Amino acid sequence: MKVLYGILIIFILCSMFYLSQEVVIGQRCYRSPDCYSACKKLVGKATGKCTNGRCDC
């Protein structure tokens, strides 16, 4: 049972590391499509979202 908890903790830590690879840029936005061109230049992918008036790539 302890092995299961150990594997679960490792999985959660790895997931948190992978999910925190977003890049917050200083461009102001009002909706997500405003971020697509800036994220394409910065990261290479046109995926981004507008969070609290800032672009997250």
Swiss-Prot record:
Subcellular location, record wording: Secreted
Alphabetized UniProt keyword annotations: Calcium-activated potassium channel impairing toxin, Disulfide bond, Ion channel impairing toxin, Neurotoxin, Potassium channel impairing toxin, Secreted, Signal, Toxin, Voltage-gated potassium channel impairing toxin, Voltage-gated sodium channel impairing toxin
Single Gene Ontology MF annotation: toxin activity
Disulfide-bond pairs as recorded: C29-C50, C35-C55, C39-C57
A Pfam cross-reference name: Toxin_2
InterPro entries xrefs: Scorpion_toxin-like_sf, Scorpion_toxinS_K_inh
Gene3D superfamilies on file: Knottin, scorpion toxin-like
Keyword Oxidoreductase: no
Propeptide positions: 21-22
PROSITE patterns assigned: SCORP_SHORT_TOXIN
Signal peptide span: 1-20
Expression by tissue: Expressed by the venom gland.
Domain notes: Has the structural arrangement of an alpha-helix connected to a beta-sheet by disulfide bonds (CSalpha/beta).
Protein family membership: Belongs to the short scorpion toxin superfamily. Potassium channel inhibitor family. Alpha-KTx 04 subfamily.
Biological role: Blocker for small-conductance calcium-activated potassium channels KCa2.2/KCNN2 (Kd=80 nM) and KCa2.3/KCNN3 (Kd=197 nM) and ERG1/Kv11.1/KCNH2 potassium channels (53% inhibition at 5 uM). Has also been shown to inhibit Kv1.1/KCNA1 and Nav1.7/SCN9A with a moderate potency, as well as Kv11.1/KCNH2/ERG1 and Kv1.2/KCNA2 with a low potency.
This protein's name: Potassium channel toxin alpha-KTx 4.2
Species name: Tityus serrulatus
Phylogenetic lineage: Eukaryota, Metazoa, Ecdysozoa, Arthropoda, Chelicerata
